[in-house]
């Protein structure tokens, strides 16, 4: 059986992902998305488990209860990771995998899950937790003739 670091090294070498190895046990991987252009995910090899930690979005400005309800409902059907908040209220995807279970297929499934959950939840989380900021940004751009291209997904909040 390969050591977890060797498995992760082999996986990253065979996939077109941007990453850096912070130290011998920590890999910082940038996953490309669509709604959320990039998701930064850390894989951290511990004594007994591989920790997964990916930033999703900062602390919501409003409707925190609705945001948390959304996250808890999503958690019920997710594979190997779950939404969590840190001490600042920022939202992350977190998980643990026993070191004995670390193989390339599982790393692929976990990184795929991180990407899918972060990307598919990004716009709904923005709508729930930042709708006032989106409306202000829309008005500001319209008043200055700025592009609304990256706000088009939220047009229904304005009209």
Residue ranges and their predicted role:
Residues 56-60, 97-106:
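A generic structural motif
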Residues 101-138:
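A contiguous, mid-protein "functional segment" used to position or interact
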Residues 53-94:
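Short, internal acidic amphipathic alpha-helical interface segments
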Residues 126-159:
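Short, highly charged C-terminal tails/helix-capping segments
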Residues 12, 22, 34-36, 75-78:
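Short solvent-exposed loop/turn micro-motifs enriched in small/polar/acidic residues
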């Amino acid at each position: 059986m390969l050591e977890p670091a060797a498995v992760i090294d082999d996986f990253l070498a065979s996939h077109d992902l941007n990453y850096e190895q912070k130290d011998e046990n920590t890999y910082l991987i940038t996953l490309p998305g669509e709604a959320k252009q990039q998701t930064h995910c850390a894989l951290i090899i511990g004594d007994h488990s591989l920790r997964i930690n990916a930033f999703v979005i900062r602390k919501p400005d409003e409707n925190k209860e609705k945001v948390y309800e959304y996250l808890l409902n999503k958690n019920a059907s997710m594979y190997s990771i779950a939404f969590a908040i840190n001490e600042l209220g920022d939202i992350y995807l977190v998980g643990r995998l026993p070191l004995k279970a670390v193989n390339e297929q599982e790393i692929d499934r976990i990184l795929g899950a991180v990407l899918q959950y972060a990307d598919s939840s990004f716009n709904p989380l923005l709508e729930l937790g930042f709708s006032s900021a989106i409306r202000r940004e829309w008005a500001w751009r319209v008043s200055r003739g700025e592009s609304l291209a990256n706000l088009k997904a939220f047009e229904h909040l304005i009209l």
